[in-house]
Curated annotation (Swiss-Prot):
UniProt keywords, alphabetically: Aminoacyl-tRNA synthetase, ATP-binding, Cytoplasm, Ligase, Nucleotide-binding, Protein biosynthesis
Gene Ontology BP term (one): valyl-tRNA aminoacylation
Domain notes: ValRS has two distinct active sites: one for aminoacylation and one for editing. The misactivated threonine is translocated from the active site to the editing site.
Similarity section: Belongs to the class-I aminoacyl-tRNA synthetase family. ValS type 2 subfamily.
Pfam families on file: Anticodon_1, tRNA-synt_1
Transmembrane feature ranges: none
Domain of life, per lineage: Archaea
Gene Ontology cellular-component terms listed: cytosol
Binding site residues for ATP: K547
The protein's name in its UniProt record: Valine--tRNA ligase
Organism, as annotated: Aeropyrum pernix (strain ATCC 700893 / DSM 11879 / JCM 9820 / NBRC 100138 / K1)
GO MF entries: aminoacyl-tRNA deacylase activity; ATP binding; valine-tRNA ligase activity
ATP-binding is among the record's keywords: yes
Length: 823
């Protein structure tokens, strides 16, 4: 009797229930714990993991984004790096407050009027964040993400003290200043917004054709405007210098309808000749163009809209009305007075708040500004030193930088954010900043001075700032937080060389831009070595997922049904890096089937012992050929991983495992592995065993970043250790050796395909013998003849040059022929 071969892996299917057991095991082993020791000799890679807003559960797109980040972290670990891949929440800002207001039915500005009320509102925010953050952590953990969970998020005293320290530094250097300027204002959120926080939506409205009167001769000048409610704030009319209709009007004066004030007329190239009548109303303020022209032309603004989005006393007959109602009312008055020529329905783009979608107004506010206009070129130069993956997204950053027209307003009339560490002396007006180091709450604590350092006024005259920072002022220093810039200079100097920023393309103009700006201002260095930009997660129809559309897909039922590895496989193959990716449940099923296939392969391989020593010591030429072909696949996967891509590696390793290893090599050496017929020597049999194990082990290691569960389960069963503590496989051959050997493997693959096709054409099962024909294959794979004959149950011989006369090709172009056997 021959040897008995029983699989060491008894279970016939991969059980996704094993994933939870592995999670507990990984936790017990501290498998993904970051090493923050500056003396660790390994080169450091820091992943500036996006701190998510815990303002709601992730949909499948968000979950896929974070699993891709984990895949890159796992790859770097395989390459021997000390990988710092933290996960902590972005627990600041307007989005959190909006969600809390909705959840608890409160209004922040009403609740926070007193110190006690503000404390209660902040407690609600913290309570809400704790719950949602816990759900997010459970989700990424269930997906097998090996992040190091840092419980100190952006609302922790540690993080906030760092944000405040950067403010103090920049204030003292003159890069932050306070000024009264026109700013974009959200009447609903009661706060200033930066340019990057503004979204636009299409809105249906009217364009109104309004009569002005030329003071010099009394004739009418018709002006088209979408903002007639701002007539009281009109300071000038402008026309294009090349517009012949208005030649000679520059320097003259028009009389504003209803309000009767004098308005000067100017030429300006910014006017669009083909819009309306070609005359543009410059008023305070309809849009950013108005703001720019008021400054350029030295016009005196008249404020018409208050912080509630209501017209003030300067608006005359429409005072006290909300903006939209005021627009309708002023149009009625103009029509009644014979001053409205006509109105036309239009659809135009309206700026809205990025969170609550309320239309924004431009009002005058005294705010704190960070200088950014002076740094536009420097930010571009810093970005030019970074490696963008993919390169096409670099232009989006540059285009945004070019579009910036004002310094960054960083102060917000909100509550759940990092407080601005500033006190104002009510006696002398001095602005006072404390020493950096600890976390300050100026609205709730005593000032850190006994008296005003400038005028000596007692402490009671030092008024603490009540505003907080724009949340991006916090988030933008995340690369400094994860590299320990403020606390461990030695670690920072080593870690800051290899910082990876993974993020979506939708926040290029915010998180990416602000981070580059802030790190440059604070350190003089580029913030990142690599910038990895992904597309947007879409539903199966290619639409963004929104509650309003009812198309948000919860990842948890998908994971429960198919497993974390299956979901991760979809996340890897959903789209090429940088492009939008649609959810496709069929690709999740493919991932589940792939995990099952790997398990079955491993179960087969586990039937045979793993011989000691190098697999090359025993390998036949056939074995070496497939090891060399695997080398090619793994080199290509390694290169793609190194480009921060997971799409190509996932497809390459899938092809290697399923189409090459399972479909061809395993089938080819199955007879040799069992050797029940005694056709092969013991050495040849053990060579097959060694190669089976080596190919499987290499596939497991290469696939482990993408499918960490099933690969680790198999590796622990067969090889006694975690796959996640292994190193990326070294090549087994020189490039020249590999090229020659891999070519032989490809030829063997083509022979298999041709013979199987031949059997099908003859109506035979693949396991049935070919006893009426002889198969002719090109020379060069003589060493594979016995394996091929055992697999196909066919007589096989090689030929050189032209195929023998009378033979027929098995598959066109295959170079594999067959000829009838001589009786």
């Amino acid at each position: 009797m021959g040897e008995e071969f029983k699989p060491a892996i008894q279970e016939k299917r991969w059980d996704i229930g094993e994933e939870e057991k592995l999670l507990s095991l990984w936790d017990a082993e501290d498998l993904h714990k970051s090493t923050l020791d500056p003396d660790d000799p390994r080169e450091i890679v820091v992943i500036d993991t996006p701190p998510p807003y815990p303002s709601g559960k992730w949909h499948v797109g968000g979950a896929a984004h974070y699993t891709q980040i984990d895949m890159i972290a796992r790859y770097f670990r395989l390459k021997g790096y000390n990988v710092v891949a933290p996960f902590y929440a972005d627990r600041n800002g307007l989005p959190v407050e909006v969600q809390v207001e909705k959840t608890y039915g409160v209004v922040a500005h009403e609740m926070a009027r007193t110190t006690e009320g503000r404390e209660r509102f902040l407690a609600l925010c913290s309570e809400f964040l704790d719950k949602v953050e816990s759900e997010i952590v459970q989700l990424w953990r269930r997906l097998g993400c090996g992040f190091d969970y840092w419980r100190e998020g952006t609302d922790s005293p540690r993080y906030r003290s760092m944000t405040q320290a950067t403010f103090i530094d920049l204030w003292r250097r003159g890069l932050i200043y306070e000024a009264e300027r026109p700013v974009r204002w959200c009447p609903r959120c009661k706060t200033t917004l930066a340019e990057a926080e503004i979204e636009h939506k299409e809105d249906e409205d009217f364009i109104y054709y309004v009569k002005y009167r030329l003071e010099e001769d009394g004739r009418d000048l018709v002006v088209a405007t979408t903002r007639p409610e701002l007539l009281a704030g009109c300071a000038a009319l402008a026309y294009h210098p090349e517009d012949e209709r208005y030649k000679g009007l520059a320097g003259k004066t028009a009389i504003a309808p209803l309000y009767g004030h004098r308005v000067k007329i100017v030429e300006h190239p910014a006017v669009k000749k083909d819009f309306g009548t070609g005359l543009m109303m410059i008023c305070s303020y309809g849009d950013e163009e108005d703001v720019r022209l008021f400054l350029e032309l030295d016009l005196k603004p008249k404020v018409l809209i208050d912080e509630n989005g209501v017209m003030n006393e300067n608006a005359g007959p429409i005072a006290g009305l909300p903006v939209k109602e005021a627009r309708r009312r002023i149009a009625e008055i103009l029509e009644r007075e014979g001053l409205l020529v006509k109105k036309e329905r239009i659809v135009h783009s309206v700026p809205v708040c990025w969170r609550c979608k309320t239309p924004l107004q431009i009002i005058h506010r005294r705010e704190l500004f960070l200088r950014q206009l002076d740094f536009k070129d420097a930010v571009k130069q810093a970005a030019a030193k970074m490696d963008f993956k993919p390169e096409m997204h670099r232009k989006k950053l540059y285009d945004w930088i070019d579009s910036i027209k004002m310094d960054w307003p960083i102060s917000r009339e909100r509550f759940y954010g990092t407080e601005i560490p500033l006190w104002t002396c009510e006696k002398c007006g001095a602005k006072l900043v404390p020493e950096p180091g600890r976390y300050y709450r100026p609205w709730a604590e005593e000032p850190p001075w006994d008296s005003c350092p400038r005028c000596g006024a007692p402490r009671r005259y030092l008024k603490g700032e009540t505003r907080v920072f724009d949340t991006w002022f916090d988030s933008s220093i995340s690369p400094l937080y994860v590299t320990r810039w403020m606390w461990d200079k030695r670690f920072y100097e080593r870690a800051s060389r290899n910082v990876l920023r993974p993020q979506g393309q939708d926040i290029i103009r915010t998180w990416l831009y602000y981070s580059i700006l802030r790190v440059l201002q604070l350190t003089g260095k580029p913030a990142f070595r690599w910038v990895r930009i992904t597309g947007l997660g879409l539903d199966p129809k290619g639409r963004p997922m929104h509650k309003s559309l009812g198309n948000v897909i919860d990842p948890e039922p998908i994971i429960a049904k198919y497993g974390g590895d299956a979901f991760r496989f979809w996340a890897a193959i959903a789209a090429k890096l940088g492009y939008d990716y649609r959810f496709d449940e069929n690709k999740v099923k493919t991932g589940r089937n792939f995990a099952t296939k790997l398990w079955n392969l491993a179960r087969f391989v586990s039937s045979f012992p793993r011989p000691e020593g190098s697999p090359l010591e025993k390998a036949t030429e056939v074995d070496k050929a497939f090891l060399a072909l695997a080398d090619e696949y793994l080199e290509a996967a390694d290169k793609a991983y190194g480009e921060l891509d997971v799409y190509e590696p996932a497809n390459l390793i899938y092809e290697l495992a399923w189409d090459i290893f399972a479909s061809h090599y395993v089938e080819l050496v199955k007879e040799r592995s069992y050797n029940r017929s005694g056709l092969f020597t013991r050495e040849e049999q053990e060579a097959a065993w060694a190669t089976l194990h080596e190919l499987l082990r290499r596939i497991l290691v290469a696939l482990s970043p993408i499918m960490p569960f099933v690969t680790d389960a198999i590796h622990r069963r067969l090889y006694g250790s975690s796959v996640h503590r292994q190193r990326w496989p070294d090549p087994l051959f020189t490039p020249e050796e590999r090229r020659e050997l891999a070519g032989k493997a490809r030829l063997i693959v083509s022979v298999n395909k041709a013979v199987w096709n031949l059997k099908r054409s003859m109506g035979k099962k693949l396991y049935e013998p070919l006893d009426t024909v002889e198969v002719l294959v090109p020379s060069g794979i003589e060493s594979a003849r016995r394996d091929l004959e055992a697999l196909h149950k066919a007589a096989i011989r090689t030929y050189t040059g032209a195929p023998p006369e009378g033979s027929e090709e098995a598959i066109p172009g295959s170079s594999v022929y067959y000829i009838a056997k001589k009786s």
